[in-house]
Amino acid sequence: MTGVQTCALPIYLKEYYSTLEEARADLVAMWNFFDPKLIEIGAIPNIEVAKAAYDSEARAALAQLHEFPSGDTIEEDHRRGTQLIVNFIRDKTGAIQPVERDGKVYLVVKDYDEMRKGVGMLLAELMRIKAEGDYDAAKALISKYGIHFNTAWRDQVVQRYKSLDLPSFWCGINPDLLPGNSPTDIRIVYPRDMVKQQLRYVVITGR
């Protein structure tokens, strides 16, 4: 075969491809957070950073529900990916559990080791699905864990956000990472404003 080769995975995984990729990207980071090599090279100061990342993922699955004030389904791929990760880990390991305090529900990490096992389990399955182009497995997994949510929790979260007077959506500017003379010598720069960033995404994704 000659010339530029293109990936055919979106053809096989169809409407579930983007959700799978969003979840897979997060899972790779979540798995590597607990690698002691990160502390060794100075990427993180201690293991508490990894624990905070796991706490943030659990919290995000609940907090993001304020973006869906009606209905009981999620269409956006990154939000589906977060629900997929947290709901899968809750179901398979019990490492994340709902806790009620002062009449408010929270999703709390009870066991970080078990959560990492769940991260590994789901990452392995998503990698298998991607490698085999297993559409039926992607559909079943995302339909079970990534699309539907607890509407009572959503209603509570919406009210909590209203009391904080926070915006429903926000946008961030992503940096470029410029390499230096060593693997840990990275310079962070912000060369684009929001408009240029979004136009760049259109060029990359074609949409």
Please describe what each predicted stretch is.
Residues 3, 7-9:
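Short, small-residue-biased leader/transition segments that mark boundaries at the very start
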Residues 5, 15, 48, 64, ...:
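Residue-identity detector for glutamine
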Residues 11-23, 45, 49, 53:
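Alpha-helix capping and helix-loop boundary segments enriched in small/acidic/polar residues
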Residues 17-35:
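An active-site-proximal "capping" alpha-helix that borders the catalytic cofactor pocket
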Residues 30-129:
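Long, well-structured alpha-helical subdomains associated
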Residues 99-207:
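Non-catalytic terminal regions of proteins
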